[in-house]
Design a protein with these regions (language model features):
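Catalytic palm subdomain of template-directed nucleic-acid polymerases
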Residues: 1-16
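Residues that cap or initiate secondary-structure elements
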Residues: 6-8, 65-66, 108
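Terminal appendage regions of diverse proteins
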Residues: 10, 79-197
């Protein structure tokens, strides 16, 4: 959770991912201490909004320049054990407070694998060649695949819209032709009646 007055742009999310993944690659040692809530607050530790803490708290520090957090869930000895991180969502949880949710390690690998498979399947369905240039650059690949799938999604959406517009146009033309045909049939019947009399 963090304070910010608006949602993050894709560029800002990418910058955050890059910063975090750089820190992960540095393999910084985790500093975990248990202390009283007062001591933790004196050190500048940040408590999460709405969370309840006991008399003793676990304090996590993952490197200089980053916030010190009260934490009950990080169990890595060094940041390198995280492997890499990918943001999955960013939402507002209250006025001026945003929340980033992300996957790391195996979760990030699974997400990347699913995205690769989706990319290859979309290419197959569209009969276009798909290739993955550098599978070792997982985060870069993830972003590239995500951008490609978003682009394809927009194109497919546009194509669907174009088809729907054409269908609507044909329905309107059919309605007009039926009305015109009905008018001609009525006119022909009237003409036939006049001839018969």
């Amino acid at each position: 959770d963090f304070t910010h007055n608006k949602s993050l742009s894709e560029e800002e999310k990418n910058q955050i991912e890059d910063l975090i993944n750089l820190e992960i690659s540095k393999n910084t040692k985790s500093i975990i201490e248990t202390m009283s809530m007062q001591e933790a607050q004196a050190k500048g530790a940040i408590a999460f909004f709405g969370d309840k803490y006991g008399d003793e708290v676990r304090v996590l520090n993952l490197g200089e320049g980053f916030s010190i957090e009260l934490c009950g869930g990080t169990h890595v000895k060094e940041t390198g054990q995280i492997e890499f991180m990918k943001i999955t969502s960013e939402t507002g949880i209250s006025s001026g407070v945003r929340r980033i949710e992300a996957v790391t390690g195996e979760g990030a690998k699974n997400l990347l694998s699913n995205l690769k498979n989706s990319y290859l399947e979309v290419g197959k369905q569209l009969h276009v060649e798909t290739k993955i240039d550098d599978p070792s650059n997982d985060l870069g690949l993830f972003r590239s695949l995500n951008e490609i799938l978003l682009s394809i999604s927009k194109e497919v959406s546009t194509s669907v819209d174009q088809v729907q517009n054409k269908i609507n146009q044909l329905i309107d033309e059919n309605r007009s032709l039926n009305e015109e045909l009905g008018t001609k049939e009525r006119s022909n019947k009237a003409s036939d009646l006049l001839k018969a009399t």
